[in-house]
């Protein structure tokens, strides 16, 4: 039997017929309900001439319904709604390992679960070291930045300064709990420091050189910079002022995670926090039908105002 799959070509995404995958004894076959678009997927799309020959089936922020389980799988059963670590998931069905899924509480709509993306933020937040009363700045208020901001507020940050050049992102940051929000092109670091002083924790969530520089300006002595942004431009090369990092005696922490067991644990924690109402993704999500995948990627490439996270939904809206 075949299924619909989004395949990346030189001209963009095409919906093609491909075989429904066959699982082994330790895997699950899952009917896709929704899958988010990651900035990593967008990077591949924008540079597709370099990727289509070897990496043309994407999607790893998926949620769905378990259809079939391997003979060794006992933790979930057909009919369970899960969020998963899996690739590729821009398709009617995807396969995940039994260790790579988390069952969703009934109160969480799978369209907004985004378990893998939320897990990345939760893992980073577990390394913030936020204490009640800490003053925190977030540089970059896209989807990841604003989930991290909500997590820092839950952890007890007493004052949060959001920084982003896009007005819709600044407005959303304050809607979700930031105390103040600045455009870094209009309000320079000196002015922010004069108004609020230095920050105990600064989260870099933009993935660009200027964000690293701004974090260096804002962080206090013996403070922490947490790198959450995914640095892809210029082959990921960045420069830092090591003399200033040395003098300030700061901790610089890579917030990323690659170990599956740690990411699944963070995904489980994230779904619990979402269930309890401590974080929300819904205001950040724009839903597209699956066959609108090319439209979604073009909107993201254009930087459509108010578009934080595109989610492909398999059933028609």
Model regions: which residues?
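Glycine-rich beta-strand-centered segment in the early N-terminal region that forms part
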Residues: 21-35, 48-88, 105
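Glycine-rich phosphate-binding loop and adjacent beta-alpha segment
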Residues: 210-272, 276-278, 314-317
